[in-house]
């Protein structure tokens, strides 16, 4: 079929139907959203939960939500800017931080639902494939599906690091190893050691070592915060191991006290008096004037 030019005449505009607002803004993939939100018709009042992973320049957001007609409802959320209280001060947007954020949201939602003792997940991180097995005499594992939005699903992407953290945290998420670091599309094989190295930030440590040897100025510029905190390449694995254990020990969200907004405002004019204050002021003026007259007459 040859090229057909679209004639934008009256009939074209009369039949034209605009796309959804969030599709016009390039924010939502409705083809994927439909399949992530529609539940089987024989499952009544059972929402389909989604593990939502969103990446920004300075933060990683991981949420567990389900869809309702009035809008999505978030069951639980975790952010990479919470990681400093678990000992991770820098590198809050790399693969290792994404894994920790996924682990945090998994332990947090299971703690909220009272399933954290039944489903501990993978306590020893090896980088290998892990799937949660439901217990025989108890509730099933919490099942959800990965929602990456408009992010590119390339092999080794950070969204899959967050998913791996959630799976190791005890959530039941359908997945394969084909998108984890260490998978080779040519040989169709998966190297778990490469994946484990990414989970513990060893790819960052290797880059730190090579950059320090090749260009010390670039090393000081790119890793200035690491240098300021005294973090070396050999320290990263221990930092992430301690963070994983700290997350498992206490995944709950701590509500920070809001700063008091009691600000003393400057006033450039006189404050308006109430009726009682005005009467008191006039009475004081009268008493002072009478006292002044009496002192003059006595003199």
Curated annotation (Swiss-Prot):
Alphabetical list of Pfam families matching this protein: Ribosomal_L18_c, Ribosomal_L5e
Any one GO CC term of the record: cytosolic large ribosomal subunit
Family label: Belongs to the universal ribosomal protein uL18 family.
Subcellular location: Cytoplasm; Nucleus
Tagged with keyword Ribosomal protein: yes
InterPro entries attached to this UniProt entry: Rbsml_uL18_euk, Ribosomal_uL18_C_euk
GO biological process, one term: ribosomal large subunit assembly
Subunit structure, as described in the record: Component of the large ribosomal subunit (LSU). Interacts with Fmr1 to form the RNA-induced silencing complex (RISC), a ribonucleoprotein (RNP) complex involved in translation regulation, other components of the complex are Rm62, RpL11, AGO2 and Dcr-1.
GO molecular function: 5S rRNA binding; RNA binding; structural constituent of ribosome
HAMAP family with a match to the protein in the record: Ribosomal_uL18_A
Keywords on record: Cytoplasm, Nucleus, Ribonucleoprotein, Ribosomal protein, RNA-binding, rRNA-binding
Annotated organism of origin: Drosophila melanogaster
Primary location recorded for the protein, binned into one broad class: cytoplasm
Keyword Ligase in record: no
Transmembrane segments: none
Function text: Component of the ribosome, a large ribonucleoprotein complex responsible for the synthesis of proteins in the cell. The small ribosomal subunit (SSU) binds messenger RNAs (mRNAs) and translates the encoded message by selecting cognate aminoacyl-transfer RNA (tRNA) molecules. The large subunit (LSU) contains the ribosomal catalytic site termed the peptidyl transferase center (PTC), which catalyzes the formation of peptide bonds, thereby polymerizing the amino acids delivered by tRNAs into a polypeptide chain.
Name of the molecule in the record: Large ribosomal subunit protein uL18
